[in-house]
């Protein structure tokens, strides 16, 4: 489930002038996607606030992230916000506070295929690993 699409389809949050969604986390939690008999993967930058069995946080070196966001024509303020968030472990910290099992993966030097394989392996083994990626040198 792509969480951004799910929120738009289910009218969770308010669309801002810049096209981004402003989302009330409690509203999202009350309306989160439900798994049927099979497991589902929920992908999105707010997914770590949901009630999950397992949470994987993908990490990227802040300088690499800045290059990628520049290539996607993100605004300077949005790039800065994302880079600072990554460097300060914001999503990881929130995931650790909200989830029982967290696994982080540094994707900086990995291909999408390598990341996919690592995610599958982590899910199958229910591994837990957090706090192994450190970007404090960025500042």
PLM regions: where:
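A glycine- and Lys/Arg-enriched "phosphate-lid" helix/loop adjacent to the NTP-binding pocket
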Residues: 15, 60-103
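Short, well-ordered beta-strand core segments
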Residues: 40, 55-57, 102-104
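Short loop/helix-cap segments at secondary-structure boundaries that form the rim of catalytic
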Residues: 47-53, 97
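Short hydrophobic/aromatic-enriched beta-strand-loop microsegments
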Residues: 1-3, 56-62
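Conserved nucleotide-binding/hydrolysis micro-motifs of P-loop NTPases
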Residues: 7, 61-64, 109-110
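NTP-dependent small-molecule kinase module
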Residues: 96-139
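Conserved protein kinase catalytic core
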Residues: 49, 65, 112
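ATP-dependent small-molecule kinase phosphotransfer cores
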Residues: 1-49
